[in-house]
Design a protein with these regions (language model features):
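A contiguous strand-loop segment
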Residues: 2-94, 127, 318, 324-327
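C-terminus-biased signal that marks the final domain/tail of proteins
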Residues: 2-5, 12-14, 128-129, 136-137, ...
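Short acidic-glycine loop/turn motifs at beta-strand connectors
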Residues: 8-11, 70-72, 145-149, 155-160, ...
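Short, surface-exposed beta-strand-loop junctions and turns on beta-sheet-rich folds
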Residues: 21-23, 82-84, 158-161, 293-297
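A short, polar/proline- and glycine-enriched secondary-structure boundary/capping micro-motif
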Residues: 24-30, 86-90, 162-167, 174-176, ...
Length: 327
């Protein structure tokens, strides 16, 4: 399972996610320059497009992005959506895009949510595997840009494609986004502040602990619990003064729902855990990340790469723990 966050603070916009799985696929930071030719299975190729940076794997010289941001600050992340995602057959009047092409197809062409929405009006997410060894994953997507604090959720269900405006700027997994959003109604009394005694004011009920306003905030590893908790954390997060402080704030939001090993068994002796957490400064094109085995924040700068070349640039993850010994 996974968690994604869209966060605007001051003049900076941040977008990122936790990738929660039981195995690593050899993720790396991948920069796709403007002249790398994106070839698609059913639609016209993009031979010149916006440059991208994100996390993914490269197979047969093709970037399979888990999350990415383009040079204009438009960002996307794909999250697990099992049992609900329903990809379609080819349609003659639509842009037939496979899910593994969806991120580059949008980010290669759109500079904003408004432009992405225009592309989505003709989208048909089709069931075409990357290969026999790499079948499609059931996904839904969060999209954010640098122009507003709002974001989009895209889901392809049995009854068709749904594009939701997302007022809270977070996404996890099942159930569908509209149900996740409605579920927040059950937590309208949760607060970062101590609440007045409304149970029975005449009865002495003491604030015996700090944090009682968040007593009913869920803490499970399940996707509905994580949606509520990360929405609460994000919507109450500080708006710090400097970009680096804001990056730190963003990682604290993600880490509020990270998964340690051995707490979420998905198969006998196999446990889901947070493989990496990412945060992109979408205004500056800086991709920050931490990994399960290295809490230090590492960064790759999009604009330090030659963006007019035609070859992918990859960066192996710094996943060995770094300790700053002070004596």
């Amino acid at each position: 399972m996974c968690t994604a966050v869209n966060f605007q603070t001051g003049s900076h916009h941040f977008f990122g996610r936790n990738l929660d799985l039981e195995i690593s696929y050899g993720e790396q930071v991948v920069v796709t320059p403007r002249n790398y030719p994106f070839h698609f299975r059913q639609v016209a190729p993009l031979t010149h497009h916006y440059a991208l940076i994100g996390m993914g794997i490269v197979v047969d010289n093709y970037p399979l992005y888990f999350d990415a941001t383009n040079e204009k600050g438009l960002s996307m992340a794909g999250l697990n959506y099992p049992g609900n995602a329903d990809y379609k057959a080819l349609a003659t009047d639509k842009a037939n895009v496979t899910p593994f092409e969806f991120i580059p197809w949008v980010l290669g062409q759109a500079a904003s949510i408004a432009e992405a929405k225009q592309l989505l009006t003709k989208l048909n997410l089709v069931k075409i595997n990357f290969s026999d060894d790499l079948p499609l994953s059931p996904l839904h997507w969060l999209i954010g840009d640098t122009h507003s604090a709002t974001s989009l959720v895209v889901e392809c269900d049995k009854d068709g494609l749904h594009v939701y405006d997302n007022p809270v700027g977070v996404l996890t997994n099942n159930p569908s986004f509209d149900k996740q959003l409605f579920n927040l109604n059950n937590y309208r009394s949760v607060s970062p502040r101590v609440q007045e005694n409304s149970f029975q004011p005449a009865t002495a009920l003491n604030d015996y602990s700090r944090g009682l306003g968040s007593h009913f905030l869920p803490g499970g590893m399940d996707s509905m619990s994580r949606f509520v908790k990360v929405a609460f954390t994000k919507l109450n997060a500080p708006h710090s003064a400097t970009p680096l402080e804001q990056v730190t704030d963003f990682f604290h939001i993600l880490h509020s729902v990270e998964q340690p090993k051995n707490l979420d068994e998905v198969a006998p002796n196999q446990f889901e855990y947070t493989i990496y957490s990412s945060c992109v400064d979408a205004d500056q094109g800086i991709y920050y990340y931490t990994t399960y085995t290295n809490n230090q924040i590492n960064a790759v700068k999009l604009h330090n790469v030659d963006l007019d070349q035609a070859k992918l640039t990859t960066y192996a993850l710094a996943d060995q723990q770094t300790v700053n010994y002070q004596n």
